[in-house]
């Protein structure tokens, strides 16, 4: 009964539901990388020995942005910071989609640079998306967090599984997958974004 009541309360809040979905799509984008990274670096690039170091090195990018998030969120606010990071995530992914459409794989340095920047953006997205989703439902934080995690995972795993099967001969499908997940998340975010209050006109 408590869980049912909490679930009903959860879906009453538009922003909570919306940012739970965006968390799912962004997590799905990351899982695309996780599921395909070994195949990409070892089979497509032949970097069997170097793969563990590249994998670990890319994680530093997420750690750095997660660390910086605590400072920057005080300056810009959760929503603005998340919007800036998501816009950058989408823009860079779209750029790579266009640059490498019907082209051979980019050099490993170019690929690692792409992933580093994308992961840097992710560090700002995960925490802020979840915080925004939980903000209206602090009174049911436990149940809310459970529903948020469950729904976002249910969204993320099929996305990663579907997109990952196309990453066979080139990394281009991964660029497309990240761009699509980012754009859907951006669309949802803009859809529920609260309009800024219009300043009153001064008399005179």
Question: Which residue stretches match the model-derived regions?
Answer:
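C-terminal transmembrane helical hairpin of 12-TM major facilitator-type secondary transporters
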Residues: 80-129
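Extracytoplasmic gate region of multi-pass secondary transporters
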Residues: 14-58, 62
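A late C-terminal transmembrane helix in Major Facilitator Superfamily
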Residues: 129-172, 177-178
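Juxtamembrane intracellular "pre-TM" segments in multi-pass secondary transporters
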Residues: 1-20
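Helix-to-loop junctions at the C-terminal end of transmembrane segments
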Residues: 65-80
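Multi-pass alpha-helical transporter architecture, strongest
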Residues: 180-204
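Residue-level signature of mid-helix packing/kink "hotspots" within the transmembrane helices
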Residues: 59-67, 157
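Transmembrane alpha-helical cores of Major Facilitator Superfamily
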Residues: 24, 56, 60, 116, ...
């Amino acid at each position: 009964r408590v869980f049912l009541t909490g679930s009903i309360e959860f879906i009453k809040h538009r922003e909570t539901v919306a940012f739970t979905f965006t968390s799912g799509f962004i997590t799905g984008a990351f899982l695309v990388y996780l599921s395909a990274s070994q195949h990409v670096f070892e089979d497509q690039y032949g970097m069997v020995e170097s793969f563990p170091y590249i994998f670990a090195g890319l994680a530093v990018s997420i750690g750095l942005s997660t660390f910086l998030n605590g400072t920057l969120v005080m300056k810009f606010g959760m929503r603005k910071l998340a919007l800036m990071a998501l816009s950058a995530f989408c823009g860079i992914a779209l750029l790579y989609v266009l640059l490498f459409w019907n082209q051979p794989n980019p050099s490993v340095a170019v690929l690692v640079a792409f992933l580093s920047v994308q992961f840097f953006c992710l560090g700002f997205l995960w925490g802020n998306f979840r915080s925004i989703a939980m903000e209206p439902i602090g009174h049911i934080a436990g149940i809310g967090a459970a529903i948020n995690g469950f729904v976002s995972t249910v969204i993320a795993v099929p996305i990663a599984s579907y997109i990952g099967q196309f990453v066979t001969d080139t990394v281009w499908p991964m660029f497309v997958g990240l761009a699509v997940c980012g754009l859907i998340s951006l669309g949802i975010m803009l859809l529920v974004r609260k309009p800024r209050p219009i300043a009153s006109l001064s008399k005179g």
